[in-house]
Structure formats: structure tokens, C-alpha cells
């Protein structure tokens, strides 16, 4: 299947009729709660512990890239290198109504040092992941300026394990940041 066809299919699978970050958070929380029994160990079940010494639960984390990159990575089951040490994710929700796409792109470019974020379309698509125990919270944060001039701070996370299981992908779609 051609890359355009894959993108077309991917766009059809996005969350529909969600217009605010609160609605998206509720929708994702419900989906995450439905999956919880599948991703958390039950009593007396073994669990893989990452090299850092324990399982870390960060809730949903978001990856921002363009649709063709997303399709190539997901078709292959791996995250893209969007940071010099692997994949950079954040807890910034993709339907944040008081932040523009340009500002998000600026923050991602500054945080990652990735030249690809020079074009806002490089972060116009999101994927929400649930990575129990597979990410490291970085000491730095992404600071953005809202459309009202407020400083907004979001955490940054890194994953050097770029392979992912299909069940770790919770949602994906087109970002709905403010137009500015």
C-alpha cells in the first residue's frame, strides 16, 4: 500500500467529535481503564522491570510527528528518532485549546534539538501511548506560552526502547491546537 493510502487510513482512525482537551482526556482515560487489566500484572504474575530499577507509571504520553513518519514507524512497530537519544514524548495533550501549533512546534524543537520541527506540519499529528515502566522522565521541561500570554509547563519523557507493542498505542489523530 502506498504511503498516501496508509495516511488516509490512519486519518480515518482518529478520535472524532472531540473538540477540547477535557473531552480528549476523558475519552483516553476511559480507553486506558478498559485496557488496564491487559497491561497491569495480576497477583503473583511476573513483570519485566526496566534497567532503571522499577516500573514507572506516567499515564498517557504523547508523540508529535507528521502523518507519513507516523505511518512508517507504526507499520514497522517502532517509534521515530525525534531526539538525539531516541524518542521524546510529553504529557502535553493534543487538544490544548490555549496553545498554537506554532508554539508547540517551537517548544518541541527547543526541547529535542530536532531540525524536523522547523516546519509546524512535522508536529500536526499525535499518538497517545501508555508505556508502563518503559520511559524515563527527563529533568528538563517544555515551556510554552499560551495564547493569553501565560507560561505553561509540560514534562518531557524519553524512550530509548523504540520498539513498541500495538497495545501500547492508545489513540492517535490530528492535533487540534489553537489557531494563531
UniProtKB/Swiss-Prot annotation:
Lineage, top-rank taxon, reads Eukaryota
Taxonomically, what lineage is the organism?
Eukaryota, Viridiplantae, Streptophyta, Embryophyta, Tracheophyta
Instruction: Say yes or no: keyword Hydrolase present.
Output: yes
Catalytic activity, EC? 3.2.1.-
Which species does this protein come from?
Panax ginseng (Korean ginseng)
The answer on whether this UniProt entry bears the keyword Phosphoprotein reads no
Q: What does this gene product do?
A: Hydrolyzes cytokinin glucosides thus liberating free cytokinins.
Kindly state a single biological-process term from the GO annotations of this entry: carbohydrate metabolic process
* Keywords, comma-separated and alphabetical: Cytokinin biosynthesis, Glycosidase, Hydrolase
Gene Ontology molecular function, alphabetical: beta-glucosidase activity
InterPro entries, alphabetically?
Answer: Glyco_hydro_41 (IPR006065)
Q: What is this protein called?
A: Cytokinin-beta-glucosidase 1
> What gene is behind this protein?
ROLC1
Amino acid at each position: 500500500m502506498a504511503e498516501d493510502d496508509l495516511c488516509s487510513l490512519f486519518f480515518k482512525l482518529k478520535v472524532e467529535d472531540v473538540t477540547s482537551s477535557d473531552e480528549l482526556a476523558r475519552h483516553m482515560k476511559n480507553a486506558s481503564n478498559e485496557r488496564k487489566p491487559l497491561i497491569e500484572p495480576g497477583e503473583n504474575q511476573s513483570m519485566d522491570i526496566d534497567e532503571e530499577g522499577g516500573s514507572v507509571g506516567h499515564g498517557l504520553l504523547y508523540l508529535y510527528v507528521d502523518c507519513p513518519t507516523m505511518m512508517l514507524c507504526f507499520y514497522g512497530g517502532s517509534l521515530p528518532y525525534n531526539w538525539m537519544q531516541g524518542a521524546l514524548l510529553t504529557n502535553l495533550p493534543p487538544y490544548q485549546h490555549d496553545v498554537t501549533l506554532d508554539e508547540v512546534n517551537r517548544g518541541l524543537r527547543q526541547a529535542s534539538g530536532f531540525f524536523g520541527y522547523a516546519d509546524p506540519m512535522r508536529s500536526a499529528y499525535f499518538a497517545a501511548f501508555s508505556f508502563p515502566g518503559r520511559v524515563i522522565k527527563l529533568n528538563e521541561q517544555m515551556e510554552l506560552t499560551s495564547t493569553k500570554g501565560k507560561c505553561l509547563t509540560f514534562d518531557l519523557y524519553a524512550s530509548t526502547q523504540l520498539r513498541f507493542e500495538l497495545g501500547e498505542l492508545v489513540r492517535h489523530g490530528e492535533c487540534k491546537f489553537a489557531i494563531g
